[in-house]
Swiss-Prot record:
Belongs to the CinA family. SMART domains: MoCF_biosynth. It comes from the Bacteria. InterPro entries: CinA, CinA-like_C, CinA_C, CinA_KH, Competence-induced_CinA, MoaB/Mog-like_dom_sf, MoaB/Mog_dom. Disulfide bonds: none annotated. This is CinA-like protein. It comes from Nostoc punctiforme (strain ATCC 29133 / PCC 73102). CDD domains: cinA (cd00885). Pfam families: CinA (PF02464), CinA_KH (PF18146), MoCF_biosynth (PF00994).
Length: 416
């Protein structure tokens, strides 16, 4: 038995809003141990929705709909489902009373159009909506087919799922096994290269291992099916250990870890401090660091030296080197790192200078060229060159540049 998630709404198809409901439901199904292999987004069109239902019932036994339960003419989910299964709609007086009271609490009178929300397929059970006017339903129109409908508003749908659908599914025997996953994170290695290194692990049945790409990083999702989270972790732990050993320094964290949080813990453990000097990232590196609660323990501040005059006045970058090598160069990156470390009196100084685009590139210095400078104890200084030209978009180049800088510091802290 498996489930299928069907999200209804033209606004989803047009990309006007993100489909957070599908993500939420996928995570919830995993926690209940219910497999699901398909997610569908369909616009507010009854004929296309019927086609989706026809396909869904051929491959899944639990159909979960979100959206299309409002009072407007394009909210057609319930009536389309009823029409597909050739079942009449009936007006439910409990829903009418609930909607009437909610309007009264706001000092308003229920609109006639809201009566539409009280029409549900004959034989369906109401799923109350504590906050909104659109109730859901649970309905078994055929043997071995169970349908849930929920409003598309996440703040309404999430509690309705947890308070009504989860208890029902558990009463049907689900939840005795769960699917639990851990996400291993890697920086400095491509998806194909990592997949090749761990290829034998990609064939495991339980836990399973699957690679996928993030924003400049690669992840391995390790998922286990077991009777409890603790039992799943016991299955995952030895595989996780082996994967970390294979990846070496390319592995940096799990689940919600970020390069900024990992670097922060390393600095805190060694009682060292960090300052940053940024050009093309415009404060993005400092923002990543200060998103971590308690980062003032090790992060002392930074300089956004976007203009060359700031590089000279605040960081002590040499004018002659700027003229000779340009602002985007290893020499200037190193001087920026030394300058911020010296002026803020920190253990480490980290700098970034580059061309984020889309303009500003040349034949010799194309868009995506980035230099990272790292100054540390005992006057040691080094620089790293990156070519992020294949990375699309200014924002993403800035993001991967900041993380690349953090990764260099992480590797230095781990290997000195």
């Amino acid at each position: 038995m498996s489930a299928e998630i069907i999200c209804v709404g033209t606004e989803l198809l047009l990309g006007d809003i993100l489909n957070g409901n599908a993500q939420f439901l996928a995570q919830q199904l995993a926690q209940l141990g219910i497999p699901h292999y398909y997610q569908t987004v369909v616009g507010d069109n009854p004929e296309r929705l019927k086609q989706v239902i026809e396909i869904a019932i051929s491959r899944a036994q639990i159909l979960i709909f979100t959206g299309g339960l409002g009072p407007t003419p394009d909210d057609l989910t319930c009536e389309t489902i009823a029409d597909f299964f050739k079942t009449p709609l009936v007006e439910n007086p409990e829903i009418i009373e609930d909607i009437t009271q909610k309007f009264a609490q706001r000092g308003r009178v229920m609109s006639p159009s809201n009566r539409k929300q009280a029409l549900i397929p004959q034989g369906a059970e109401i799923l109350p909506n504590p906050t909104g006017t659109a109730p859901g339903i649970i309905w078994q129109p055929r043997p071995k087919i169970t349908i849930f409908t929920f409003p598309g508003v996440p703040s309404e749908m999430h509690p309705m799922w947890e308070e009504t659908a989860v208890p029902f599914l558990k009463s049907q025997g689900w939840g005795k096994e769960i699917i639990y996953s851990r996400s291993l994170k890697f920086w400095g290695i491509g998806e194909s290269a990592l997949a090749e290194k761990v290829s034998s692990y990609l064939k495991l049945p339980n836990p399973t291992v699957a690679p996928y790409a993030g924003k400049g990083e690669v992840r391995l999702r390790v998922s286990a099916k077991a009777t409890s989270e603790a039992a799943a972790e016991d299955l995952i732990a030895p595989i996780e250990k082996q994967l970390k050993e294979i990846a070496g320094l390319d592995f940096y964290g799990v689940n919600n870890d970020t390069l900024a949080s990992v670097v922060g813990e390393l600095l805190r453990a060694s009682k060292e401090t960090l300052s940053v000097a940024e050009s093309c990232t415009g404060g993005g590196l400092g923002q990543m660091l200060t998103e971590i609660s308690g980062s003032s323990d090790y992060f002392w501040g930074g300089v956004i030296s976007y203009d060359n005059s700031v590089k000279i006045k605040l960081l002590g970058v040499n004018q002659e080197d700027l003229d000779k090598f340009g602002a985007v160069s290893a020499t200037v990156a190193e001087q920026m790192a030394i300058g911020v470390k010296t002026r803020l009196a920190t253990t480490w100084g980290l700098s970034i200078t580059g061309i984020a685009g889309p303009t500003g590139g040349t034949d010799t210095k194309p868009v995506g060229l980035v230099y990272v400078g790292l100054a540390g104890p005992k006057d040691e200084v080094t620089s790293f060159e990156y070519q992020f030209g294949t990375v699309r978009g200014r924002a993403l180049i800035r993001h991967v540049s900041a993380n690349a800088a953090l990764d260099n510091l992480r590797r230095k802290l781990l290997t000195r």
